[in-house]
Amino acid sequence: SKADVSIILKDKKNNTANGTTDKNGMLILPASEHKAYIFGYADGTFRPDNNMSRAEAAAIFARLISEQKGEKISGKSNFNDVSKSEWYSDYIGYLSKYGIIKGYSDNTFRPDDNVSRAEFVAMTVRFNSLFNDVKKGSYTVKYTDVATNYWAYSDVAYAKHAGWLN
C-alpha cells in the first residue's frame, strides 16, 4: 500500500470527512474531522488512573451514537437514581431510548459504580447492533469464568467471535 493517499468519506447524510492513508493503507482522520468522545474534568484534570464509572461509559457511547446518527443527545431516564439535574441524565436517557444500557432489577442504574468489563462489552455489542446486523446466540466462548448462564454470555461470545476480545 501507498502512504498519504487522500481519501474523502461520505456518510448517509452526505457529510464528508477528509483523511489520508498510512503506510499500511489504514485511514487516518485528523482530529478536526470527528468529535471527542472522552472528556476531561471541570477542574482541568484527566485522571488517567481512575476507573471509569457507568455514567462516564454511558456518555462515551451516547456521543458515538449522536455523531453517527447526527442527533442531539437528550432523553428522559426512568431510573430511580438518575436525577434530571445530574450531568449524565441526558446521556443515560438517550442510551435507554436505544436499548444500549440496562439497569438493575431495583430500577436503578448506579451511575457512580465502576463499569465492569462485561457491562462494557454488552454496551459495545448493543452499540454495534444499532448500525450492523448482529446475530448473537450461536457463538460460544471458553473463558473459565464466564458460564453459559452468565447474564452477558452471548455478548461476550459475540465480541470474542468478532475479534474484539483476545
What are these regions (language model features)?
Residues 1-12:
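Short, ordered, surface-exposed loop/turn motifs in non-cytosolic proteins
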Residues 12-27:
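Short, acidic Ser/Thr/Gly-rich low-complexity loop/linker segments typical of extracellular
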Residues 23-55, 61-89, 97-98, 102-121, ...:
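Feature responds to low-complexity, polar/acidic, surface-exposed segments characteristic
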